[in-house]
């Protein structure tokens, strides 16, 4: 049942991408959001590259993740990356969705994922997408309502 549900979610999410383009929407997180709503274990089943680099922190995630992806690509790696900064579970799912076939397996050639991950969303992502390298840019209390205290964010990341 789980695999059928995953495939249905995958196909619906992949179909949503051209629909979003036709209606002039970016779709940086909607396909992944749809996939995860239809199959809550979507991140578990979707194909992932053998090497995963995750970048998290309060500030600088997009710059650091794009720089790492650029360096890896310049050195011949084929990289999946959420360059637009869609860094919550739905954006991560959209990024992985872009790199997989209609059967959910990783497309040939991809060897690395460089994923910007929202520090507050990490507890929903890392159980399914386990990074080989975790880069933490910094932890600040720049938004008290959201992050409360740096120790709280550190607790989430651990």
Label every model-predicted segment:
Residues 3-158:
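Phosphate-binding loop of NTP-binding sites
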């Amino acid at each position: 049942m789980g695999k059928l549900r995953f495939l249905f979610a995958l196909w619906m999410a992949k179909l949503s991408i051209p629909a979003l383009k036709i209606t002039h929407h970016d779709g940086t997180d909607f396909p992944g959001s749809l996939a995860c709503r239809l199959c809550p274990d979507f991140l578990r089943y979707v194909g992932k590259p053998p090497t995963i680099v995750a970048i998290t922190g309060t500030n600088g995630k997009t710059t650091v993740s794009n720089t790492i992806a650029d360096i890896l690509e310049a050195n011949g790696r084929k990289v999946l990356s959420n360059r637009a900064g869609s860094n919550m579970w739905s954006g991560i799912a959209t990024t992985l969705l872009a790199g997989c076939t209609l059967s959910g397996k990783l497309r040939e050639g991809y060897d690395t994922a460089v994923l910007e991950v929202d520090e507050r969303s990490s507890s929903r992502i890392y159980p399914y997408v386990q990074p080989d390298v975790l880069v933490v840019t910094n932890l600040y209390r720049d938004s008290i309502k959201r992050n409360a205290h740096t120790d709280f964010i550190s607790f989430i990341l651990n």
